[in-house]
Amino acid sequence: MNRPSRGAGAELAPGQIEYEFGIPIPGVIQPREAWTKTALKQMPAPGAIHWEALFGRVAPVAIDIGCGNGRFTLASALERPEWDHFAIDTLPAVVRYGTRRANQRGLANLRFAVIDGWRMLNDYCGDQSVDEIHIYPPQPYCDPKKVSRRMLTPDFLLLMHRRLKSQGRIFIQTDRPAYWEYIQDGVRR
């Protein structure tokens, strides 16, 4: 496979691999007829999302909170086609990147939406309705004036726990030791 040039407006052909800053984006570009539509352009009225209706099947569900450009979720959706993935971020621009990439790879087991983690779990996920929650990496807000903006508060950790199925798992990654200790303290409460 040829490495595509990434000039402005460069379009990738089927079979090509997309690169970002020299790093391959997971998956191979599919022919246009195999592309999917992964964007949830508007959230429904608040209430538990029926995952089976959204994805058209019964499958385990993983939510990626703060998905950014979707690199992790793309890889997970490709590696685990038997799982359904729901990726969210508050920034429309990065969600558009992820959506385009998932569409071009024909990933019917992935959806993207612009929404924050608290609202998603509180307003759209029922108790014990999710198998996995991924957060890579959460914004640490190290400035003492901004600490109150942290998402991973004890209340949010409790909300995640309530939304997980009995054998569900939470995955959190941070490169900030002090923030990791803060998260662990929240879990212990």
Regions from the PLM with identified roles:
Residues 1-63, 71-78, 100-127:
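S-adenosyl-L-methionine
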Residues 65, 88:
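Conserved beta-strand/loop positions that form the S-adenosyl-L-methionine
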Residues 68:
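Conserved glycine-rich SAM-binding loop
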Residues 83-86:
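Short beta-strand element of Class I
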Residues 91:
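Conserved SAM/SAH-binding beta-strand->alpha-helix loop
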Residues 152-166:
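A short glycine-rich, Lys/Arg-flanked "PGG" loop and its adjoining helix->strand segment in the class I
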Residues 167-174:
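Conserved beta-strand signature within the Rossmann-like core of class I S-adenosyl-L-methionine
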